[in-house]
């Protein structure tokens, strides 16, 4: 006796999610994530571990996204303390901000170990498996293409992302510029400034480097990493889920 094949298959079986895989997207591409029910543009700024650097562990091997425009202006910390791990901005990024993302986004974003300078007058960089466990984070100065050859006070708390250009030339600066309400504005980084305990690096409104006290309200551009298997809708480029 043979087995009957029911036309249409199992009606309870979910259809596979299809779309454009994050890992196939060109660096510089724009995609969309949902924030508070609104589709917001993010740029693909790197594929894989930045510069294949051992500062990053395998958790950072994915598709790096950076919010195209500045989200808002807020202080890095409530006091002039540049200890990133305990900062108000790290708490906000992984709390209030992350909770505004859609359920698809929250499920897809990777938990990673990001390299970071301890701060508070301590220039030690914790990296690899000792990095800070986060889902959303600020970029560092080296990731934007600056190094200690540009300014001694830059800590080596990351390596250049593919989207950015090394140095301080006009084209390198142009790629770092971000806007708030359609006007270029300064945005803050996770890199503490120098050996002091109260200031942090920022990217100014011309794309050059600057710094500010940690309690100053500067622009915030959240970054996050998706698995390369995450899928985007072919028409809208909105994140759909994972394969």
Locate each region found by the language model.
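Short, intrinsically disordered N-terminal pre-domain segments
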Residues: 1-11
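Collagenous Gly-X-Y triple-helix signature in extracellular proteins
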Residues: 11-243
């Amino acid at each position: 006796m043979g087995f009957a094949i029911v036309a249409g298959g199992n009606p309870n079986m979910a259809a596979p999610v299809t779309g454009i895989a994050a890992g196939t997207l060109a660096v510089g591409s724009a995609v969309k994530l949902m924030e508070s029910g609104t589709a917001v543009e993010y740029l693909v700024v790197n594929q894989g571990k930045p510069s294949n650097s051992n500062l990053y562990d395998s958790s950072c091997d994915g598709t790096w996204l950076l919010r195209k425009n500045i989200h808002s202006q807020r202080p890095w910390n409530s006091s002039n303390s540049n200890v990133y791990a305990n900062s108000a901005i790290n708490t906000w990024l992984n709390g209030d901000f992350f909770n505004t993302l859609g359920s698809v986004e929250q499920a897809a974003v990777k938990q990673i170990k990001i390299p970071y300078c301890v701060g508070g007058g301590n220039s030690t960089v914790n990296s690899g498996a000792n990095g800070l466990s986060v889902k959303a984070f600020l970029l560092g100065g080296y990731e934007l293409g600056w190094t200690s050859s540009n300014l001694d006070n830059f800590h080596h708390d990351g390596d250049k992302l593919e989207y950015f250009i090394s140095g301080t030339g006009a084209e390198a600066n142009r790629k770092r510029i971000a806007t708030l309400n359609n006007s270029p504005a300064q945005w803050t980084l996770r890199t503490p400034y120098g050996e002091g305990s109260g200031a942090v690096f920022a990217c100014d409104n011309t794309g050059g480097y600057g710094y500010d006290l940690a309690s100053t309200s500067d622009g915030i551009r959240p970054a996050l990493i998706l698995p390369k298997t995450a899928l985007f809708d072919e028409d809208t480029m909105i994140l759909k889920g994972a394969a």
